[in-house]
């Protein structure tokens, strides 16, 4: 969770039309291959419209610790899905559409911020650099340019957003990041 008192920033980060990258790990029912993920890479049709192409891949048990701390059990598969929309339950619905319902889901990256150093039940203030990244619209994930079959990407870090007549950023960093599992 990301707590902020800046309503414009919140709107810019959360609205599906802003295309902020979100990275999820999912443990799904059934055996899933990279080839099975192709409909998600092309953009899959859900009941509320066509999704933008996702960046996705099957991940191994070592990478999937957030969703499978005791390892990936037989009959399940761990996947990483990177989306730019953020519709309600989008990742769960996308994976269900290809007949692999989600057993466990974890968002591990939001707009370039990672949760790896935030313990469950704790929080920390964002650094000034992280606040700048968020105000610039986040940054694309590292995997976007290096993975075969990746969805087209845009450089969201180069986009500037204007937040009305708000003056300079507050002197005290009021943004919070909190992970609750």
What is the predicted role of each segment?
Residues 1-143, 147, 179-181:
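RNA pseudouridine synthases
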Residues 143-181:
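Intrinsically disordered, Lys/Arg-rich low-complexity segments
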């Amino acid at each position: 969770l990301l707590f902020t008192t800046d309503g414009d920033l919140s709107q810019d980060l959360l609205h599906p039309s802003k295309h902020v990258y979100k990275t999820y790990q999912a443990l799904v029912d059934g055996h899933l291959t990279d080839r099975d993920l192709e409909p998600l890479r092309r953009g899959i049709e859900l009941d509320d419209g066509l999704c933008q192409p996702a960046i996705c891949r099957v991940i191994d048990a070592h990478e999937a610790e957030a969703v499978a701390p005791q390892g990936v059990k037989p009959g399940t598969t761990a996947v990483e899905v990177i989306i730019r929309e953020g519709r309600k339950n989008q990742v769960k619905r996308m994976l269900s559409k290809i007949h692999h319902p989600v057993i466990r889901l974890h968002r591990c990256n939001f707009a370039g911020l990672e949760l790896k150093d935030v313990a469950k039940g704790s929080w920390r203030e964002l650094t000034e650099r992280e606040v700048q990244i968020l105000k610039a619209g986040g940054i694309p994930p590292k995997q976007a340019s290096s993975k075969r079959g990746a969805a087209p990407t845009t450089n969201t870090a180069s986009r500037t957003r204007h937040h009305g007549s708000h003056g300079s950023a507050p002197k005290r960093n009021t943004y919070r990041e909190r992970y609750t599992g």
